[in-house]
Amino acid sequence: MNGNIDLVVFTLDENRFALKLAAVERVVRVVEFTPLPKAPDIVLGIIAVQGGIIPVIDIRKRFRFPERETQLNDRLVIARTAKRSVALLADDVTGVMACPKERIVEAGKVVSGMAFVEGIVKIDAGMILIHDLDAFLSLNEENMLDDALRESAGSMNGE
């Protein structure tokens, strides 16, 4: 395993998380999102980006962090899964980090029950959890989100 993987590092309550840079489309300041009825609890709502509808995911709920009001300086990390683009709500984005592949430990070797964590990077100040966005939503959550998005699109089109 030679070479580096570029990671976009973001924070939630002083905890560090990352996505592979190749999956990240952009990072933007938080904007108001529209509620999406019948979506899974982890979905805060939807935003419109360049003519597309993107669900906003509350990763606080996935990690069972305390809820908090959205702040004006929060960020949305817009990234692509195999199925769709999603926006992850983060407290801040600290930057891009070139991480040597050999420093990434398989998540299953360190924590169990977190299929949505692909790997862990140990750093001087603790660790960074690398998300696997394709496993972030359960199959049931994916299906609920698909149905909610279809229903929302139908109501916008007057169906």
What are these regions (language model features)?
Residues 1-159:
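An acidic, low-aromatic, low-complexity terminal/linker signal
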